[in-house]
A protein has these predicted regions:
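Short amphipathic
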Residues: 1-5
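Conserved beta-strand-loop-beta-strand hairpin that lines the nucleotide-binding pocket
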Residues: 45-127
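Conserved short strand/loop->alpha-helix "switch" segment adjacent to the catalytic nucleotide/phosphoryl-transfer site
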Residues: 14-38
Length: 127
């Protein structure tokens, strides 16, 4: 889905992600996926320069979900370690903690930042 590069697109991307995961019977990863899509879209909207839109793509395999956010800025994100009193800068720390894998790739128009979740459900204790 392509959205305007504005803050309200974060909420729209979360709702669309929830709808897709429900349809794909992946509701068990909805909370983590919502946080990841929120962080990735927020990063693009706040830090990508000269962009009008962001594109959010979701891809599901047998055991994984990939969330990818594309924008037209060719500059790759620079994760940093926030200071003790910083109120921002924690996005990629959260992405790293939630995702089984994440990265950045070049696209024709700019870049795509992606994060993957393991979608296998843990089985409960046996009887």
């Amino acid at each position: 889905m392509t959205l305007p590069a504005v803050s309200r697109s974060v909420r729209l991307s979360r709702h669309a992600t929830h709808a897709a995961l429900t349809a794909w019977q992946l509701a068990h990863v909805d909370e983590a996926a919502a946080l990841l899509v929120s962080e990735l879209v927020t990063n693009a909207v706040r830090h990508a320069e000269g962009i009008d839109v962001v594109t959010v793509n979701l891809h599901a395999g047998r055991t994984w979900l990939r969330i990818e956010v594309q924008d037209a800025d060719r500059h790759w994100p620079q994760p940093r370690i926030p200071g003790r009193y910083d109120e921002s800068g924690f996005g990629f720390i959260l992405v790293d903690a939630l995702a089984s894998n994440w990265g950045v790739r070049e696209t024709e128009a700019g870049k795509a930042v992606w994060a993957e979740l393991d979608t296998r459900q843990e089985s409960g204790p046996g009887i």
